[in-house]
């Protein structure tokens, strides 16, 4: 079988609330770490989410 191109990642809130989203990304098109602004329901506002490795 071919190796999967899409990698599972965890987007963790920079607000320090512990909230995170899980998603996938294409390793070939985006080799750098992602930084996305998304809604944090614990902080109840939009904050930056940084990519971390999914265990």
From Swiss-Prot:
Indicate what this protein is called per its UniProt record: Large ribosomal subunit protein bL33
Q: Which family does it belong to?
A: Belongs to the bacterial ribosomal protein bL33 family.
Instruction: Respond yes or no to whether keyword Ubl conjugation is given for this record.
Output: no
Q: Does the keyword Lipid biosynthesis apply?
A: no
The scientific name of the source species is Bordetella pertussis (strain Tohama I / ATCC BAA-589 / NCTC 13251)
Q: Which Pfam families does the UniProt record give?
A: Ribosomal_L33 (PF00471)
Q: Keywords of this protein's UniProt record, alphabetized?
A: Ribonucleoprotein, Ribosomal protein
Q: Return the InterPro entries for the record.
A: Ribosomal_bL33 (IPR001705), Ribosomal_bL33_sf (IPR038584), Ribosomal_zn-bd (IPR011332)
Gene Ontology process terms (BP) = translation
Phylogenetic placement of the source organism:
Bacteria, Pseudomonadati, Pseudomonadota, Betaproteobacteria, Burkholderiales
Q: Which Gene3D superfamilies match?
A: Ribosomal protein L33 (2.20.28.120)
UniProt GO MF annotations: structural constituent of ribosome
- Gene Ontology CC terms, in alphabetical order: cytosolic large ribosomal subunit
Source domain of life = Bacteria
